[in-house]
Amino acid sequence: DPLFPDKKVVNIFCEPSTRTKISFEIAASNLGCQIIDFDVSSSSLEKGESLKDTIDNFAKMNINLCILRHKDSVIHELIDQTDSMVFISGGEGSISHPSQGLLDIMTVRHKKDLDNSNILIVGDLDHSRVFQSFIDGMANFDSKITLCGPKELCKDVIDSSNLDYEEDLNKALKGQDVVMALRIQHERFEEKKNLDK
């Protein structure tokens, strides 16, 4: 029997997604929820309606849960706006992606001890929401985390983090139990960088 047949769920993805969006749809379906098919590109958001107004309308339609992905950090404002709808973050710009961070931590836990592992994170650290959420979650454990990547893609993290940084990938790989590779977030750059080095 469905657990929540009377609950309505809407996914609002203002940035592209495949795995996160479909995973949330499958989870809602498995729980017996009614899934509202919402396509941002064919919605009133495209005609200039604010996200706040869209959410307000959904709340009036008795939608219970909104999974939201947005380029900006807006979810806290929306939570303050309505008490009749629950929100889950599907990712906010380069700020956070809590569900992916949790999945990554559980993946490491499946193979390694979260308190005694050497973990290397390689790639575009300054623009990765996945990196931010993984680091936030791993702060609860006693693993040694090393960062690696081109300095022009890691400068903000290097300046603000107390984690070890090694620019040379071959050196950074030595002694690691886990390597987390992050893609370059081309969509977050205002101008194209030369990253073919």
Regions found by a protein language model. Name each.
Residues 84-86, 118, 146-148, 193-197:
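P-loop/Walker A phosphate-binding loop and immediately adjacent motor/lid segment at beta-alpha junctions
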Residues 2-109:
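Phosphate/diphosphate ligand-binding glycine-rich loop within oxidoreductases
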Residues 49-53, 163-164, 194-197:
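Charged helix-capping and loop-helix junction motifs
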Residues 42-46, 65, 123-125, 158-160, ...:
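Short, flexible loop segments at the rims of nucleotide/cofactor-binding pockets, characterized by
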Residues 183-197:
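Glycine/threonine-rich flexible loop motifs
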